[in-house]
Design a protein with these regions (language model features):
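N-terminal anchoring/stem segment of glycosyltransferases
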Residues: 1-83, 97, 101-106, 160-164, ...
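A structural signal for well-ordered alpha-helical segments within the folded catalytic domains
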Residues: 25, 86-90, 195-203
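A residue-level signal for conserved active-site and pocket-lining positions in enzyme catalytic cores
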Residues: 31, 92, 116, 156, ...
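Short, hydrophobic beta-strand segments that form beta-sheet elements in well-ordered domains
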Residues: 36-45, 109-116, 134-135, 243
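Short, polar loop motifs at secondary-structure junctions
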Residues: 41-49, 60, 117-124, 140, ...
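Short loop/helix-cap segments at secondary-structure boundaries that form the rim of catalytic
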Residues: 47-54, 123-129, 236
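GT-A fold catalytic core of metal-dependent nucleotide-sugar glycosyltransferases
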Residues: 84-151, 155-163
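Catalytic core and acceptor-binding pocket of nucleotide-sugar-dependent glycosyltransferases
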Residues: 161-273
Length: 273
């Protein structure tokens, strides 16, 4: 086993609305501080002049553009937020196939971190470097029935070989997410409200647990890797390695768009551990 801070990693995220651009920049600053040797790939959009939704992608070799294979227009409704979160599955499949080889010559290792996430120290997740692994915080509150336990996709690590079990899940997740971009909002079986990308991924990994070539599923501690702050005071949760500043509280519902959230960047940054 090795800690992830001792392994090559491609860390990625995107911001698909101008309101998220500064969030993405702030998140990446914390990654550079705590994991200066990781490869970083980011996207910002929408970019004008393309038929389908398009992001400008910043790679180590320069900039390029990636366009979704389906079209949608932001219309100011709640569905905007859900369409954008469904882009995550497609984005991760793009990263896996085009860029993940940067992480390791024979093993892809890609980590997603939401733009509103902030690292507070070096991540200490332990991985078997040659295993097929999906690692993420899970919501497993004792008061929640086991069938409703689910992935929290603000931070996800995918590790595996080309053509392996993890790649198979990524392909299906991307296809499901792309399909749901064009569907009306559907209820989630795990949380109140419509389902999003993490619901689709949870269903896939749960169905694959019985497969003979299944991957290892690491359920990381929710409070440590998905530290949700106090919404009233803005105080971060003690003992976290990732603070998640939950921009959905401002961006999901149209009536919340003018909400004074999250706190200013300088108020969110913590001393290095």
């Amino acid at each position: 086993m090795k800690r992830i801070d001792q392994l090559p990693v491609v860390l990625t995220s995107f911001a698909y609305r101008e309101e998220y651009f500064s969030e993405l920049d702030g998140m990446m600053a914390t990654v550079r501080e705590h994991h200066p040797n990781w490869h970083l790939i980011t996207g910002k959009g929408p970019v004008a002049g393309f038929e389908n939704p398009t992001l400008e992608v910043e790679l180590s070799a320069g900039k390029t553009h990636w366009s979704l294979p389906v079209s949608f227009q932001l219309d100011g409704t709640e569905q905007d937020w859900h369409r954008i979160v469904f882009m995550k599955g497609w984005w991760m499949a793009q990263i896996w196939h085009h860029c993940a080889v940067l992480a390791d010559g024979h093993r892809n290792r890609v980590m997603w971190l939401d733009a509103d996430g902030r690292l507070t120290g070096k991540l200490d997740v332990e991985l078997e470097p040659d295993a097929e692994v999906i690692a993420s915080p899970w919501w497993t509150d004792p008061g929640t029935p086991e069938p409703e336990h689910h992935i929290c996709s603000g931070m996800i690590i995918f590790q595996g070989a080309r053509g392996g079990a993890v790649e198979s899940i990524l392909k299906r997740w991307a296809a499901d997410c792309i399909a749901h971009i064009q569907l009306p909002l559907l209820p989630s079986p795990f949380v109140p409200g419509p389902q999003g990308d993490q619901c689709l991924l949870t269903k896939l990994v749960k169905s694959d647990l019985a497969a003979p070539d299944k991957c290892t599923l690491l359920k990381l501690d929710y409070d440590k890797y998905c530290g949700v702050p106090d919404y009233k005071t803005g105080a971060p949760k003690p003992g976290t390695l990732i603070d998640q500043w939950m921009m959905n509280e401002k961006m999901r519902l149209p009536e919340d768009r003018n909400r004074n959230w999250p706190p200013p960047e300088e108020a969110r940054r913590r001393p290095s551990k």
